[in-house]
Amino acid sequence: MSENCSHNCSSCGETCASRTMESFRVPLNPQSSVKKVIGVVSGKGGVGKSLVTSLMACKMRARNNRVGILDADITGPSIPKAFGIHGMVGVTADQLMLPRTTSTGIEILSSNLILEHETDPVIWRGPVVGGVIKQFWSEALWKDIDYMFVDMPPGTGDVPLTVFQTLPVDGIIIVSSPQELVGMIVGKAVQMAEMMKVPILGIVENMSYVLCPDCGKHINVFGDSHVDETGKKYHLPVLAKMPLNPEFAKEADAGMIETFAGDYLDGAADAVA
């Protein structure tokens, strides 16, 4: 750090080597309170990250916690649909966004809830997307939230960087699938988290197997799982192995994800708590 550093980061460039992680933090507004922030990430798309986010929120809500979901997948939001939430958010007299509340009391803020029509595409460049995420955090009324889950888009680009730098993330869950290729992709997410000094709570493997409805046998439709060796390689616990279950899609499509009562994520919920 330079001897002449004033610690006033607004007076220097973003590339200044003296900047600290804390200097990028965006504070909550004085009317909001969030105790713990958990990011749900994946190195690639299509592994069920939003499903895991939704089910984790439901699991922690079922344990009598106040739960919120900040949907940071700005260009591909799916959280409101899974919970049956439609329409736009409200605004307080102080011009704070009011997250929509699900049937069980989970608070949700998503780009789909600030659009006039939920099918309208979000065609924004990275800085605009990052600005919206910061607004979802600092310009919304999050009242007494025990656990905030942040559903992030796949990869290691602008949005994860924005979330890690500006939100006080307490830990992340990495979502993967059984294919061996995913092990390499998980490695990228692990290394990014380590570079950003964000704790990794563990790995959740989705689509791990199909449970035969007749004999109960586990069928590895995507081949043998490699999540255990991936976890061992990076010294991370495997928090859950979730099956490829048609009920997930059925209930999410119907906006009734909160009615699912499986125990697949009990271990992940324990790690978060």
Identify the role of each PLM range.
Residues 1-22, 190-273:
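C-terminal lobe/tail of nucleotide-utilizing enzymes
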Residues 1-44, 88:
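Extreme N-terminal, non-catalytic leader segments
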Residues 34, 45, 71, 79, ...:
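Residue-level signature of catalytic and energy-coupling elements of molecular machines
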Residues 109, 152, 165, 271-272:
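Glycine-rich phosphate-binding loops of nucleotide-dependent enzymes
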Residues 115-163:
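Phosphate-binding/switch loop-helix module in NTP-utilizing enzymes
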Residues 143-150, 156-157, 168-189:
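Conserved Switch II/interswitch segment of TRAFAC-class P-loop GTPases
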